[in-house]
Amino acid sequence: MMTLSDLPSDLAEEVLSKIPVTSLRGVRATCKKWNTLSKDRSFTRKHLAQAKAAAAREFMVVMVMDFQVYLMGINLHKDVDATINGQGKLISLDDSNQVDISYVYHCDSLVLCIPKDCARLVVWNPYWGQTLWFKPTSLRHFPHWYMYAIGYQMRRGNRDAKTSRWLLTCRPTTKTITKNTIDHL
């Protein structure tokens, strides 16, 4: 009986090229051969070329439905029927799918999500399917009195992502996410 790890390299590469980029992390854990193949430069170029071609046909939208955050691919081109496909969903680290999100902000492919309870914030990179959860600095007032934003700051040639929070009195507090953090997001 043939196993997944016994597939010829060209067939394994073809199978892996059909897997969304956001799912490659799980593939790497399948077997050593697939892990090595998924890191191969030619495979990476081929996979990214396919993703780029698909991206040319559809655009991505972040949607909030029933307090859940979804990444959706929408294709409205005339050569195919209009389609809306789920591409990703924000979930919590403790595997509970119930992260009730009240507000969503975005900047250059990063999404800042504010849960209803405001106890912690999350920066989500939908392309890579990675998240960074952190607790805001002290909430001395009612949590919903705050406004949030996400952006970048250039420092020493690096583009650091930065989240900001304002109380309605407009006193900003910030959280810097360094380039090293972004590279791992």
UniProtKB/Swiss-Prot annotation:
User: Could you tell me which PROSITE patterns the record lists for this protein?
Assistant: FBOX (PS50181)
Record-linked Pfam families: F-box
Domain F-box, by residue range, is 1-47
Query: What name has this protein been given in UniProt?
Result: Putative F-box protein At3g17400
Source organism (scientific name): Arabidopsis thaliana (Mouse-ear cress)
